[in-house]
A protein has these predicted regions:
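Pre-Walker A adenine-sensing motif
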Residues: 1-11
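Active-site-adjacent loop/helix micro-motif of nuclease/hydrolase catalytic cores
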Residues: 26-30, 105-112, 137-138
């Protein structure tokens, strides 16, 4: 709901989202902003595999005011899929699981990931971040995940564009960072 609805529509609650983008396109910031918004609807686990809890990640947490949702937003690092399954089997586990990024998962097969995670937890929403190489999701598993997800978002120039099933306006976008987007599209 709110400012993202024109770009993303109203996805169903137990949906899988795929978010990709080139390096320095605003993808990680967008994924974290989405996680913050999802805290309005339930608990969020942010599985930070690509960055861990490095300095840029910590700065982003501070810059985006994630302390405002500290009770609902949990950052976890270094998990295997088996660890994540064990975590999600616990009572009062996260309603929303963000994995950033899928290229760092210890599972390399989409079929296995679907069986071990998605099929096992049909009442959880999964938001899956992915790297891009030459305009495509990097790796076969990322490409398969993209195909499977109902919401597909591509970040470019600090804007997030929905390519999924829930928006009627293919030109609509969500601005991740006003100043960065203005500079990017002014020089494009």
């Amino acid at each position: 709901d709110g400012e993202g609805e024109p770009a993303f529509g109203r996805p169903s609650r137990f949906e899988r989202w795929f978010i990709d983008g080139e390096s320095a396109s605003g993808k990680s910031t967008f994924v974290m902003l989405l996680g913050k918004k999802l805290c309005d609807y339930g608990r969020v686990d942010y599985v930070s595999l690509e960055e861990g809890a490095n300095l840029s990640f910590k700065k982003r947490i501070k810059r985006l005011g994630m302390k405002d949702v500290a009770g609902k937003f949990k950052v976890v690092t270094g998990l295997t899929v088996a660890d994540l399954v064990a975590r999600l089997e616990r009572p009062k586990s996260a309603n929303f699981v963000i994995i950033d990024s899928v290229q760092y998962l210890d599972v390399r097969s989409f079929d296995r990931l679907k069986k071990e995670l998605f099929d096992r937890f049909p009442r959880k929403s999964f938001i899956l971040g992915a790297q891009v190489y030459k305009g495509r999701p990097k790796g076969k598993m990322a490409d398969d995940i993209r195909f499977d997800c109902g919401v597909k978002i591509h970040t470019k120039g600090y804007r997030a564009y929905c390519q999924g099933r829930y928006t009627d306006d293919a030109e609509a976008y969500f601005t991740i960072w006003e100043e960065g987007a203005a500079k990017y599209y002014l020089t494009e």
